């Protein structure tokens, strides 16, 4: 079975990395506008909870901030509270220029 989702949205929460038991994570929410069918329709926005782990968590925290636009590939999971969470698996950069980041040092090349 295939469980992949690609999302583009704006980060709606402040970002921080939490480390527990030698694993890091960053929990954040994104707002995604639904496409309008015509010019008179109002824009509807959905909010999704996302989780990034380890290197992805550090990259999200270093490269993005609240209000920033993010694009990523992930998978859907049920959280213990029965809500759906998107697990971030791959970051995708939208800029014209490629960015390479050393996650350990935070250096951008």
What residue ranges belong to the model's regions?
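Single-stranded nucleic acid-binding surfaces, predominantly the OB-fold ssDNA-binding core
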Residues: 1-109
């Amino acid at each position: 079975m295939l469980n992949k989702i690609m999302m583009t949205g704006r980060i709606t929460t402040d970002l921080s990395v939490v480390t527990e038991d030698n694993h890091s994570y960053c929990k954040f929410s994104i707002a995604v506008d639904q496409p309008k069918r015509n010019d008179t329709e109002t824009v509807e926005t959905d909010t999704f909870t996302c989780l990034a782990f380890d290197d992805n968590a550090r990259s999200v925290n270093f490269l993005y901030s609240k209000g920033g636009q993010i694009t990523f590939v992930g998978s859907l999971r049920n959280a213990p509270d029965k809500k759906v969470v998107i697990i971030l698996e791959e970051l995708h950069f939208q800029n014209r220029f490629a960015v390479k980041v050393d996650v350990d040092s935070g250096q951008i090349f």
